[in-house]
Amino acid sequence: MLASEIIARYEAYCPQELSMEGDISGLQIGTLDKEVDKVLVALYIREQTVVEAIEANAGLIIVKHAPIFRPLKDLVADKAQNQIVLDLIKHDIAVYVSHTNIDVVEDGLNDWFCQLLDIKETSFLSQTSSEHGIGRVGKIAPQTFGDFAAKVKATFGLDSLRMVTYEKADLNRMIERVAI
């Protein structure tokens, strides 16, 4: 299937127009005018992501966070981030970025996180249009902040979790409302 057809189907669900102003989204590296047998989906593109894509013979990576965020001043291979871009180009791997639009879209990442964490009766954290918004605020069963943090850690398989509190006792504070 053409990469452009894959992206057309993806954008039928999650259009770029949902992206927040100034956000990087869409094709960032390569071309969509090529046949693709395998697609890799990633949160970030790191060296290992590129190795995995090459080994799997993936012709397209759909990624949440853009591999090129600031303008490149050069494209020399002795810089790790540049080497990633060079390897993607060398192996003809296209990169399509879907950042805030996958957060905003109904049943996107924000809604999925709420589902995983049993967050109910949600509303938008910030309205982005008449029908959409980024982030979610909702209700959870009453529990301590520490218990909810442990649930987040377990749900996402995290080794550690950074929590910002005013006092150590905040971990024992009861909460019923959270934001994603």
Q: Where on the chain are the PLM-derived regions?
A:
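Hydrophobic structural segments
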Residues: 1-180
